[in-house]
């Protein structure tokens, strides 16, 4: 059996990225995502659980990959997240958008902005002026040409592309393998979940 090709991240995480968790964390999980993508929507609670279980042992990074042809509202949703980020509320908006990804119209975005506590005048101005559009499009171009991202979610763990299922068991296994120094001690809840999920998969 041939060994799967290892695909490495070319554009490393920088201060421009939206990152949650310490830079010193032993594992960094990066997601290329799309707020309108149903697969990303399904992955969202799984990734949230991974982040909760690992705490400061994980750094989570999100990069936009809107696909307007198949997800026509994904680009405006990405702009809304960036506008929220300019007011230090990126992650709050990130959660709102994924929780309500079936409702991403202009009025919906404004409502979520109010819900997370943004300055609504500033948010409306940034959205009307497409303040973050060029940045999102440039990042998308780099994702396509440098990383060869073709769909979402695309996940990297410690700069190596993850090709398994986007479920808790698979991600925790991959994170454990990526923790070369053995610094992560999975909490009891994570170990229990891995055992239960493993039994379920085996039937």
Give names to the regions the model predicted.
Residues 28, 61, 154-156:
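Soluble periplasmic/extracytoplasmic beta-strand elements of cell-envelope proteins
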Residues 1-9, 184, 190-192:
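N-proximal helix/coil linker or "cap" segments that precede and/or mark the start of modular domains
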Residues 9-14, 134-138:
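Short gly/ser/thr-rich secondary-structure transition/capping motifs
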Residues 10-27:
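A short beta-strand-turn-helix
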Residues 25, 56-58, 151:
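Residue-level signal for beta-strand positions within conserved beta-sheet cores that form or flank
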Residues 45-49, 111-203:
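C-terminal cap of thioredoxin/glutaredoxin-like
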Residues 30-31, 35-115, 119, 185-203:
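Structural alpha/beta surface segment adjacent to cysteine/selenocysteine redox centers
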